[in-house]
Amino acid sequence: MKMPRSGLGAGLLFLLPAVTILSGVDGMAKYLTEVGYSVLQIVWARYLFQTILTFPLAWSRHGTGLLRPPDVWAQVGRSLLHATSTFLIFLAFARMPLADAIAIFFAYPFLVTAMAPWLLGETTGWRRWLACIIGFGGTLFIIKPDFGAFDAGALMALAGSVAFAFYIVLTRRVALRAEPAMAIFIQGLIAAILLSFVVAWSWRTPDLSAW
């Protein structure tokens, strides 16, 4: 399967603001771990707000069709992979500098590029590999991580990167049938529901600064 060139430019335009927003989420997660909130509670809140914020758009487009999403098990799988990845990288944030954790996590483009021919049937030429290398090098140059000690936090960041790579691959498959607003809403809903069963064990009522 080959990505249509007409969609590449639009994809990049959506990618840039998405990366900016996610960088803000990472910074807030790091702050919340530093002031004493558990990673489990932070991850739960992240998906709860995702569900609330995406529901109006998803409902306006699909209505009761949200109860019948396509590729249900693929939707569940991508939600579990994303929640696992988020949990692991937030754990890494709690144990190491933010820049170091993000630098390790950004190994995922290499993993996605390596898996794409086998799992998606997409062509992976030398230009894409070169783009990955240049992009990763640019990331390291900007954030200047310190890899003095590759500890448990670093392993969590790496494991999170692997989970996120599989999430990206599965999302590519789901995107062929599921409309984006529905897919994002379903992803947040599944994760929020599952985490609701365990978040009480590490609950701390948020104060004004946390909100």
Residue ranges and their predicted role:
Residues 127-144:
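Hydrophobic transmembrane alpha-helices of multi-pass small-molecule transport proteins
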Residues 37-84, 163-166, 186-202:
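Transmembrane alpha-helices of multi-pass small-molecule transport proteins
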Residues 10-18, 58-88, 152-160, 207-211:
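Loop-to-transmembrane-helix transition segments
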Residues 34-41, 88-105, 176-181:
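Structural motif at transmembrane-helix junctions in multi-pass transporters
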Residues 30, 149-205:
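Transmembrane alpha-helical segments that form core, pore/gating elements
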Residues 89-91, 108-130:
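C-terminal transmembrane-helix exit sites in multi-pass transporters
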Residues 19-24, 55, 79-87, 109-114, ...:
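Hydrophobic/small/kink-forming positions within alpha-helical transmembrane segments
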Residues 91-96, 144-152, 202-209:
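Membrane-interface helix caps and helix-loop-helix hairpins in membrane proteins
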